[in-house]
Protein backbone atom coordinates (compact mmCIF):
# COMPACT_ATOMS: atom_id res chain seq x y z
CA UNK A 1 0.00 0.00 0.00
CA UNK A 2 1.23 3.50 -0.81
CA UNK A 3 0.90 4.60 2.81
CA UNK A 4 3.26 1.84 3.92
CA UNK A 5 5.82 3.18 1.45
CA UNK A 6 5.64 6.63 3.05
CA UNK A 7 3.23 8.27 0.62
CA UNK A 8 0.28 10.30 1.93
CA UNK A 9 -2.85 8.43 0.88
CA UNK A 10 -6.50 9.40 0.41
CA UNK A 11 -9.19 6.98 -0.73
CA UNK A 12 -12.40 7.95 -2.51
CA UNK A 13 -15.50 5.85 -3.14
CA UNK A 14 -19.14 6.52 -3.93
CA UNK A 15 -20.38 3.77 -1.59
CA UNK A 16 -20.73 4.49 2.13
CA UNK A 17 -20.78 0.72 2.76
CA UNK A 18 -17.47 0.16 0.97
CA UNK A 19 -15.99 3.19 2.71
CA UNK A 20 -16.98 1.75 6.10
CA UNK A 21 -15.22 -1.52 5.22
CA UNK A 22 -12.13 0.35 4.04
CA UNK A 23 -12.01 2.44 7.22
CA UNK A 24 -12.18 -0.68 9.38
CA UNK A 25 -9.37 -2.35 7.42
CA UNK A 26 -7.18 0.76 7.12
CA UNK A 27 -7.94 3.22 9.94
CA UNK A 28 -4.73 5.14 9.18
CA UNK A 29 -6.01 6.22 5.73
CA UNK A 30 -8.28 9.19 5.07
CA UNK A 31 -11.34 7.98 3.14
CA UNK A 32 -13.94 10.31 1.63
CA UNK A 33 -17.23 9.81 -0.17
CA UNK A 34 -16.90 11.40 -3.62
CA UNK A 35 -18.59 10.68 -6.94
CA UNK A 36 -17.11 10.55 -10.42
CA UNK A 37 -17.00 12.39 -12.69
CA UNK A 38 -17.08 15.50 -10.49
CA UNK A 39 -15.19 14.50 -7.34
CA UNK A 40 -16.67 17.69 -5.87
CA UNK A 41 -14.54 19.32 -3.20
CA UNK A 42 -11.27 17.77 -4.38
CA UNK A 43 -8.73 20.39 -5.44
CA UNK A 44 -7.03 20.35 -8.83
CA UNK A 45 -3.30 19.55 -8.83
CA UNK A 46 -3.49 18.06 -5.32
CA UNK A 47 -2.01 14.58 -5.96
CA UNK A 48 1.30 13.25 -7.23
CA UNK A 49 -0.30 9.98 -8.32
CA UNK A 50 -3.88 8.82 -8.82
CA UNK A 51 -4.77 5.13 -8.82
CA UNK A 52 -8.17 4.19 -10.25
CA UNK A 53 -8.28 0.41 -10.20
CA UNK A 54 -11.24 -1.28 -11.95
CA UNK A 55 -13.74 1.52 -11.29
CA UNK A 56 -14.64 3.21 -14.57
CA UNK A 57 -16.30 0.11 -16.04
CA UNK A 58 -19.04 0.64 -13.43
CA UNK A 59 -19.84 4.15 -14.73
CA UNK A 60 -22.39 5.00 -17.41
CA UNK A 61 -20.63 5.22 -20.78
CA UNK A 62 -21.10 9.00 -21.02
CA UNK A 63 -19.23 9.52 -17.71
CA UNK A 64 -16.07 7.56 -18.59
CA UNK A 65 -14.27 10.30 -20.56
CA UNK A 66 -15.18 13.13 -18.15
CA UNK A 67 -14.11 10.96 -15.19
CA UNK A 68 -10.69 10.27 -16.71
CA UNK A 69 -10.24 13.96 -17.55
CA UNK A 70 -11.17 14.90 -13.98
CA UNK A 71 -8.67 12.43 -12.53
CA UNK A 72 -5.94 13.96 -14.72
CA UNK A 73 -6.85 17.40 -13.37
CA UNK A 74 -6.11 16.18 -9.83
CA UNK A 75 -2.44 15.57 -10.71
CA UNK A 76 0.44 17.94 -10.18
CA UNK A 77 2.68 18.57 -13.21
CA UNK A 78 4.53 15.31 -13.96
CA UNK A 79 2.00 13.38 -11.83
CA UNK A 80 0.91 9.94 -13.02
CA UNK A 81 -2.52 8.38 -13.44
CA UNK A 82 -2.67 4.60 -12.99
CA UNK A 83 -5.95 3.45 -14.52
CA UNK A 84 -7.46 0.04 -15.17
CA UNK A 85 -10.83 -1.39 -16.09
CA UNK A 86 -12.26 -4.81 -16.70
CA UNK A 87 -12.96 -5.33 -20.39
CA UNK A 88 -16.60 -6.20 -21.04
CA UNK A 89 -17.43 -7.56 -24.49
CA UNK A 90 -20.79 -7.12 -26.19
CA UNK A 91 -23.33 -5.14 -24.22
CA UNK A 92 -23.55 -3.73 -20.71
CA UNK A 93 -24.45 -6.23 -18.02
CA UNK A 94 -24.90 -6.59 -14.29
CA UNK A 95 -23.35 -9.31 -12.15
CA UNK A 96 -25.16 -11.31 -9.47
CA UNK A 97 -24.50 -8.52 -6.94
CA UNK A 98 -26.12 -5.95 -9.23
CA UNK A 99 -22.88 -4.21 -10.21
CA UNK A 100 -22.95 -2.59 -13.63
CA UNK A 101 -20.22 -3.54 -16.11
CA UNK A 102 -20.26 -1.14 -19.05
CA UNK A 103 -19.00 -2.33 -22.43
CA UNK A 104 -17.44 0.99 -23.42
CA UNK A 105 -15.01 1.84 -26.17
CA UNK A 106 -11.57 2.57 -24.72
CA UNK A 107 -11.18 5.43 -27.20
CA UNK A 108 -13.11 7.64 -24.71
CA UNK A 109 -10.28 7.04 -22.24
CA UNK A 110 -7.58 7.79 -24.79
CA UNK A 111 -9.37 10.97 -25.94
CA UNK A 112 -9.55 12.15 -22.33
CA UNK A 113 -5.81 11.48 -22.01
CA UNK A 114 -4.95 13.76 -24.95
CA UNK A 115 -2.13 16.02 -23.84
CA UNK A 116 -0.82 13.49 -21.32
CA UNK A 117 2.09 11.17 -22.04
CA UNK A 118 0.82 7.58 -22.21
CA UNK A 119 3.43 5.39 -20.52
CA UNK A 120 1.54 2.09 -20.66
CA UNK A 121 -1.46 0.87 -22.66
CA UNK A 122 -2.05 -2.87 -22.45
CA UNK A 123 -4.59 -5.60 -21.87
CA UNK A 124 -3.69 -8.39 -19.46
CA UNK A 125 -5.44 -11.29 -17.80
CA UNK A 126 -5.89 -10.55 -14.10
CA UNK A 127 -4.13 -13.07 -11.88
CA UNK A 128 -6.82 -12.65 -9.21
CA UNK A 129 -10.00 -12.83 -11.33
CA UNK A 130 -8.94 -14.43 -14.61
CA UNK A 131 -10.73 -11.57 -16.43
CA UNK A 132 -9.23 -9.33 -19.12
CA UNK A 133 -8.19 -5.97 -17.68
CA UNK A 134 -7.06 -2.93 -19.66
CA UNK A 135 -4.32 -0.89 -17.97
CA UNK A 136 -3.22 2.61 -18.87
CA UNK A 137 -0.62 4.75 -17.12
CA UNK A 138 -0.33 8.37 -18.20
CA UNK A 139 1.83 11.25 -16.99
CA UNK A 140 0.75 14.87 -17.00
CA UNK A 141 3.09 17.13 -18.93
CA UNK A 142 4.78 19.99 -17.15
CA UNK A 143 7.48 20.81 -14.68
CA UNK A 144 7.50 20.70 -10.90
Question: Model features per residue range: what roles?
Answer:
Residues 1-43, 59-66, 70, 80-144:
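Class I (Rossmann-like) S-adenosyl-L-methionine-dependent methyltransferase catalytic domain
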Residues 48:
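Conserved acidic residues
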Residues 51:
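A conserved beta-strand element that flanks and buttresses the S-adenosyl-L-methionine
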Residues 54-55:
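Short catalytic micro-motifs in class I SAM-dependent methyltransferases
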